[in-house]
């Protein structure tokens, strides 16, 4: 039969073939086809013949085709056919599909849809036919019966697609079904059906099956619905990430983790690559991605951003067209996230309303962590983002040349956090990705070298961390580091020091790098620039510290803790200690040459030698011998000669120029510290060992010299130095400059000898008498210099250099003076205690050291760079100062003795204030340890019991002591009130209050105590009032919103200053006694306005957040109506805040404020108030349809603004302008040009915000009209539209002024400017 059909088909006409086919029974043809296909014979040719003999022009032929199609589809799905045969059959069916009439196409399509929905497909091969059927159907123009109605082919296709997408899809055919739609012409609506269906299948599929489905979706997105595709993919993987993190965070209920981490990351990586590839082919997709993620920035950026979407954005940066805008989007998101965090941390009001969320910074670092799973496409974007953040938000140079570094007040700023995040991104990326390391290192070094004039500490910190992580790995990049060495001579000293310190571990593992550095340093030592020479000294000293000679004491013996990286390097590099000794001695030889260079170079050497000894004790002889031979040049060996030092030799005279050549005081200081260290550390370890006599004599020599200098300095008079009162100390003559230098040298030597004698005194009375004699020499010179500087009306001579006393000594001295109660010490200590001036000097030096720590992060002198030692000294000093201040109050001390300068108690308090600030700045993690050290009752045995005492409890104990002191001060009469001490006490309390936990009872007690002080004490000191009120506000905002407090204060201000209407008598409320006629304005007024501004900022932030949520949730009316319910508490809080603030402004706009900053600030804040009200109205314009109107409390707020604020604003404007006119008038009368100019400038400043305010009011009213129409509530009934504003321009007056143009050009110009400013809002009002 098959042969006959084939032979008939070979004829030119199909008539005989048709006739033959009609004679066959129904099942014969299908059975024949089935047998032929299964056997793998000529099924294709047979099928072509059947189609040729079954033309669609005849009904019989059409039905036969229909049956053959059904048979073939079943055959292909059965899986019995060979692949080639099945493909051939499907190909033929595709070719013939277009010949089918519409109704049969509909039937065929329904068959497919039923098979898909019922899951009866076996292998899905036949699905390749469905897109052809749907395409063919869309081309049919005639109307077709579908369901109960009649539809066109296009409409039928739409219904069929809808039916298909609304039914069940078997998991294994999802990809195939999605893929087939790319071959069907689809409308936007049809694409949306398909996309929604495919996205809904994500959660039902195996993870490995999602990438190919995403690929098909991206191909399909070229037809439309790009936004839905991207949103769906991002939302799914963001949710999966969140679920995965929750599972990994150790939820005990989840025994099995849903998805292994590695598998999830690989799948995400593949999908990101698919999307990036799709964007390269379709830029519209990229624009849609950026647009979608940008929307999130308007509200809450954390809603749209997730680790997955961030990784996707970073990968997109590889496409040039999107690189800048994507990095800019990420940069903006990071800073916005940190600003939001800052705002939340500073306000309890916001914390109660906004739940804690993960921040963009955390997500980005998670991306870095995830990128270990072969996400190479993300790394370049991470590196670029890291450098952009560091470049944009690193420390900046300010006007006086100083750098704004990370300090406590600034470290919480968003910019600082963003810069730190950039460094963390780069460091973590460096650790994970080997291929990118060289690029990161190169870019960091480039910035260090090329931006020397800008602050680059953040890049040096990053470099240090990179080197610390893997010094051995970086050997491969050593060429980059050695290139940087070539620029050392041209870099600032501080940069050189930090750069060399950062790369120091590399020098231990790379000898070639070390040799290269030495060559560079030797050249620099003889460079013309002073900074280059100093850099050479810094470099050599660093090498001496870190290349230990065999036999040197270990770091523990030297009480010097080395960094983990250093130990790491030491373990891995078995360097030759003998070679090190030769190397170090060569360097010492080079450094000796520096002793003939400028004073600054020598000074660096003296300051560095002590650290060299501690780290490399075997160099002690070499160092000490160098120092001794240098000292002998300036030491007078004859025991009877006075003075004992040759000061003339320390000064260099070149023509008229006089300068210091030898910093003798620092040389002696260095000798004294090195000698003390050697005696305390090395000699005890050498006891019992035979030591060369020469060495013993050596150290005895130094002791003898210091002893001789001490004795002769005590005997010397100022005349011996030619520095008595009659000497010339002016800065304008060469003799004066020389005498100043000598005076400072003598004072420095005295300080060094004071410390030396105290260290060897063993509490000997004679030694202490010597110390006092040395101090008196110091004091005399200091007094002369101050007196001469005072007469010359210049503070040049008073700029004393840092004290040469070490911080450790200051700590020991203060403890001895104020806390030593050992009986055997009392007689000798009474010598020092008898001099108040000496005790004041000791406290002053402690203050100087703490100030130095606050400004630079370290102190001068030994261990000044060691944070641990500094912290220990700080604890000891604080304990003493605290005891001294609380034991002997200032009032007691000052009543006893009337001396010039501050009392010791006041100095102690000032010291405490500086220390509390410094500890929070540099030792935040050690606060607990610090507070425990202050507890005088603490004993070592009790430490374990006290370990669980919280920081808050310890802080509260300290706070109570200062509260008592302040109460005692406030109980005194106004004339006896010590404002300096009060101010310091409030500053200390403010500093300590930051350590209290806001939820603790101690915090509440502190707040109520501060509030009580403000309510019950009236002081006219403006600075004290300001600091106390600032404390009150800072506590209040951490506990609850300050709006009620602001309202009460505004009533007090109104009561004291009176009303703008002089006929109105204001009732005085007196909530806070601290507000009085002297402090009400400008002090308290400006403070409350500043706080009001912060509240408005918070409210504005909340409104923006709500608006962002609404714009994202308006996908459907149902979604948005459900979304408004959780927002109700936030809306209510916003309205409550604005309502109370409205009453606050209601009081202030009626207050007769003095001209100046108060009026100016009030007008600006009123403008902000109306802008915020407008923002709220616009929010309700967005939501009022879905939420069913506006809430009643919003109506009340609008009513309040119309009755209590707007009319009063216009009255206040009139009041301000009337005051301006009176000022003008009085200015003209006096006819003093300077006075007139000043008055006019003030008028201009105060009236400038008026047009802005009027415009803000009118904008508010404009949007209220829109809201009234939309909500069907008449909100404007409460608004009194002013028609008689006296700031409108009157035509006749304007003409008169214009005619007088030539008479007074300046004055008239100003008036017309005012007119122009005020005219615009008035016009707008008339337009309404």
Swiss-Prot record:
One Gene Ontology molecular-function label: DNA polymerase binding
Record cross-link Glycyl lysine isopeptide (Lys-Gly) (interchain with G-Cter in ubiquitin), residues: 523
User: What positions are modified (Phosphothreonine)?
Assistant: 952
Provide the record's note on post-translational modification. Monoubiquitinated by FANCL on Lys-523 during S phase and upon genotoxic stress. Deubiquitinated by USP1 as cells enter G2/M, or once DNA repair is completed. Monoubiquitination requires the FANCA-FANCB-FANCC-FANCE-FANCF-FANCG-FANCM complex. Ubiquitination is required for binding to chromatin, DNA repair, and normal cell cycle progression. Monoubiquitination is stimulated by DNA-binding.
Give GO terms for biological process.
interstrand cross-link repair; positive regulation of protein ubiquitination
Q: Where does this one sit in the cell?
A: Nucleus; Cytoplasm
Which positions carry Phosphoserine? 407, 556, 730, 1121
Q: Which InterPro entries match?
A: FANCI, FANCI_HD1, FANCI_HD2, FANCI_S1, FANCI_S1-cap, FANCI_S2, FANCI_S3, FANCI_S4
Extent of Acidic residues compositional bias = 1301-1310
Q: What is known of its domains?
A: The C-terminal 30 residues are probably required for function in DNA repair.
Q: Which disease is it linked to?
A: Fanconi anemia complementation group I: A disorder affecting all bone marrow elements and resulting in anemia, leukopenia and thrombopenia. It is associated with cardiac, renal and limb malformations, dermal pigmentary changes, and a predisposition to the development of malignancies. At the cellular level it is associated with hypersensitivity to DNA-damaging agents, chromosomal instability (increased chromosome breakage) and defective DNA repair.
Primary role: Plays an essential role in the repair of DNA double-strand breaks by homologous recombination and in the repair of interstrand DNA cross-links (ICLs) by promoting FANCD2 monoubiquitination by FANCL and participating in recruitment to DNA repair sites. The FANCI-FANCD2 complex binds and scans double-stranded DNA (dsDNA) for DNA damage; this complex stalls at DNA junctions between double-stranded DNA and single-stranded DNA. Participates in S phase and G2 phase checkpoint activation upon DNA damage.
Q: How does it assemble?
A: Homodimer. Part of a FANCI-FANCD2 heterodimeric complex that binds and scans dsDNA for DNA damage. Interacts with FANCL. Interacts with MTMR15/FAN1. Interacts with POLN. Interacts with UBL5; the interaction promotes FANCI homodimerization.
Q: Which PANTHER family match?
A: BC025462 PROTEIN, FANCONI ANEMIA GROUP I PROTEIN
Say which family it is in: Belongs to the Fanconi anemia group I protein family.
Return the protein name. Fanconi anemia group I protein
Species of origin? Homo sapiens (Human)
């Amino acid at each position: 039969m098959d042969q006959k059909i084939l032979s008939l088909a070979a004829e030119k006409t199909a008539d005989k073939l048709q006739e033959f086919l009609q004679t066959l029974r129904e099942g014969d043809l299908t059975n024949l086809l089935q047998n032929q296909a299964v056997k793998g014979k000529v099924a294709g040719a047979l099928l072509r013949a059947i189609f040729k003999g079954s033309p669609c022009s005849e009904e019989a032929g059409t039905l036969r085709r229909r049956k053959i199609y059904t048979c073939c589809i079943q055959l292909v799905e059965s899986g019995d056919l060979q692949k080639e045969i099945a493909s051939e059959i499907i190909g033929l069916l595709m070719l013939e599909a277009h010949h089918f009439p519409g109704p049969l196409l509909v039937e065929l399509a329904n068959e497919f849809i039923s098979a898909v929905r019922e899951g009866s497909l076996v292998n899905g091969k036949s699905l390749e036919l469905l897109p052809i059927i749907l395409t063919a159907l869309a081309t049919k123009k005639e109307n077709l019966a579908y369901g109960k109605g009649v539809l066109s082919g296009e409409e039928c296709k739409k219904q069929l697609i809808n039916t298909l997408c609304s039914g069940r899809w078997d998991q294994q055919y999802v990809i195939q079904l999605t893929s087939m739609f790319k071959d069907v012409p689809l409308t936007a609506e049809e694409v949306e059906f398909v996309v929604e269906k495919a996205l809904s299948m994500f959660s039902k599929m195996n993870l490995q099956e999602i990438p190919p489905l995403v690929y098909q979706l991206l191909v399909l997105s070229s037809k439309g619905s790009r936004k839905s595709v991207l949103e769906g993919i991002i939302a799914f993987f963001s949710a999966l990430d969140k679920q995965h993190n929750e599972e990994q965070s150790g939820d005990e209920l989840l025994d099995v983790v849903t998805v292994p981490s590695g598998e999830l990351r690989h799948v995400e990586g593949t999908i990101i690559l698919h999307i990036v590839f799709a964007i390269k082919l379709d830029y519209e997709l990229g624009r849609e991605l950026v647009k979608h993620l940008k929307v999130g920035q308007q509200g809450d950026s954390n809603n749209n951003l997730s680790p997955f979407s961030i990784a996707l954005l970073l990968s997109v940066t590889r496409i040039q067209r999107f690189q800048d805008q994507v990095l800019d989007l990420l940069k903006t998101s990071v800073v916005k996230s940190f600003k939001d965090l800052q705002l939340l941390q500073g306000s309890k009001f916001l914390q109660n309303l906004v739940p804690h969320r993960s921040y963009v910074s955390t997500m980005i670092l998670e991306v870095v962590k995830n990128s270990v799973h072969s996400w190479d496409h993300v790394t370049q974007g991470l590196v670029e983002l890291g450098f952009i953040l560091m470049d944009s938000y690193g420390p900046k140079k300010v006007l006086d040349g100083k750098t704004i570094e990370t300090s406590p007040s600034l470290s919480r700023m968003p910019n600082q956090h963003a810069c730190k995040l950039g460094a963390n991104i780069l460091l973590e990326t460096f650790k994970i990705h080997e291929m990118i390391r060289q690029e990161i290192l190169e870019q960091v070094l480039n910035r260090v070298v090329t931006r020397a004039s800008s602050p680059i500490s953040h890049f040096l910190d990053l470099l240090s961390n990179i080197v610390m992580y893997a010094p051995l790995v970086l050997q491969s990049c050593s060429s980059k580091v050695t290139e940087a060495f070539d620029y050392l001579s041209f870099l600032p000293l501080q940069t050189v020091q930090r750069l060399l310190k950062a790369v120091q571990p590399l020098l231990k593992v790379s000898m070639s790098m070390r040799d290269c550095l030495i060559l560079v340093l030797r050249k620099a030592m003889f460079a013309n620039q002073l900074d280059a020479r100093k850099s050479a000294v810094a470099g050599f000293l660093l090498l001496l510290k870190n290349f230990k000679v065999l036999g040197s004491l270990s770091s523990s013996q030297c009480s010097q803790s080395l960094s983990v990286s250093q130990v790491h390097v030491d373990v891995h590099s078995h360097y030759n200690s003998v070679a090190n000794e030769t190397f170090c001695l060569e360097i010492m030889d080079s450094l000796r040459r520096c002793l003939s260079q400028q004073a600054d170079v020598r000074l660096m050497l003296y300051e560095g030698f002590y650290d060299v000894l501690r780290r490399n004790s075997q160099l002690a002889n070499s160092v000490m011998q160098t120092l001794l031979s240098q000292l002998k040049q300036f030491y007078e060996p004859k025991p009877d000669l006075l003075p004992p030092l040759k000061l003339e030799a320390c000064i260099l005279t070149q023509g008229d120029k006089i300068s210091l050549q030898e910093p003798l005081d620092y040389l002696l200081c260095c000798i004294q510290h090195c000698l003390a260290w050697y005696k305390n550390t090395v000699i005890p370890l050498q006891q019992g060992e035979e030591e060369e006599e020469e060495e013993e004599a050596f150290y005895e020599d130094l002791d003898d010299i210091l002893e001789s200098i001490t004795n002769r300095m005590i005997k010397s008079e100022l005349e011996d130095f030619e520095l008595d009162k009659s000497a010339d100390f002016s800065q304008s003559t060469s003799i004066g400059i020389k005498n100043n230098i000598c005076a400072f040298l003598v004072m420095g030597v005295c300080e060094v000898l004071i410390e030396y004698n105290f260290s060897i005194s063993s509490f000997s009375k004679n030694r202490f008498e010597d110390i006092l004699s040395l101090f008196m020499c110091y004091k005399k010179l200091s007094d002369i210099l101050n007196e001469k500087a005072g007469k010359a009306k210049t503070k040049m001579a008073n700029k004393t250099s840092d004290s040469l006393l070490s911080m450790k000594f200051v700590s020991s001295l203060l403890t001895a003076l104020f806390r030593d109660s050992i009986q055997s010490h009392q007689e000798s200590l009474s010598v020092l205690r008898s001099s108040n001036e000496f005790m004041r000097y000791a406290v002053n030096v402690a203050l100087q050291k703490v100030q130095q720590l606050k400004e630079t992060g370290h102190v001068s002198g030994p261990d000044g760079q060691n944070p641990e030692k500094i912290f220990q000294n700080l604890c000891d000093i604080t304990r003493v100062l605290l005891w001294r201040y609380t034991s002997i109050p200032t009032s007691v001390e000052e009543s006893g003795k009337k001396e010039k300068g501050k009392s010791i108690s006041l100095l102690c308090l000032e010291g405490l204030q500086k220390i509390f600030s410094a500890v929070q700045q540099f030792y935040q993690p050690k606060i607990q340890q610090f507070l425990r050290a202050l507890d005088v009752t603490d004993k070592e045995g009790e430490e374990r019991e006290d370990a669980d005492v919280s920081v808050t409890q310890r802080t509260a104990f300290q706070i109570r002591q200062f509260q008592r002191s302040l109460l005692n001060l406030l109980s005194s009469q106004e004339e006896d009130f010590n404002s300096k001490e009060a101010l310091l006490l409030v500053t200390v309390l403010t500093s300590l209050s930051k350590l209290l936990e806001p939820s603790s009872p101690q915090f509440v007690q502190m707040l109520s105590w501060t509030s009580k002080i403000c309510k019950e004490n009236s002081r006219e000191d403006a600075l004290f009032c300001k600091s106390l009120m600032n404390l009150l506000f800072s506590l209040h905002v951490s506990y609850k919103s300050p709006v009620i407090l602001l309202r009460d204060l505004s009533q007090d201000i109104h009561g004291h200053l009176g009303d703008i209407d002089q006929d109105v008598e204001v009732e005085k409320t007196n909530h806070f006694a601290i507000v009085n006629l002297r402090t009400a304005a400008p002090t308290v007024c400006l403070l409350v306005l500043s706080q009001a501004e912060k509240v408005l900022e918070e409210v504005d932030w909340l409104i923006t957040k709500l608006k962002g949520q609404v714009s994202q949730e308006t996908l459907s009316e149902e979604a948005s109506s459900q979304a408004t319910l959780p927002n109700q508490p936030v809306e209510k809080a916003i309205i409550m805040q604005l309502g109370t603030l409205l009453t606050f402004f209601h009081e202030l706009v009626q207050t007769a404020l003095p001209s100046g900053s108060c009026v100016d600030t009030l007008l600006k804040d009123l403008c902000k108030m109306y802008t915020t009200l407008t923002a709220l109205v616009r929010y309700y314009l967005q939501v009022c349809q879905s939420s069913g109107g506006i809430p009643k409390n919003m109506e009340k707020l609008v009513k309040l603004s119309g009755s209590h604020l707007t009319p009063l604003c216009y009255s206040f404007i009139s009041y301000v302008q009337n005051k301006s006119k009176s000022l003008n008038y009085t200015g003209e009368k006096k006819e003093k040009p300077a006075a007139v100019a000043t008055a006019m400038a003030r008028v201009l400043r105060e009236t400038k915000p008026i047009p802005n305010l009027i415009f803000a009011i009118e904008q508010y009213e404009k949007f209220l009209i829109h809201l009234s129409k939309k909500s069907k509530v008449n909100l404007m009934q409460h608004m009194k539209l002013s028609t008689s504003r006296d700031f409108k321009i009157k035509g006749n007056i304007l003409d008169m002024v214009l005619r007088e143009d030539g008479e007074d050009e300046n004055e008239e110009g100003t008036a017309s400017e005012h007119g122009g400013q005020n005219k615009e809002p008035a016009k707008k009002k008339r337009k309404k």
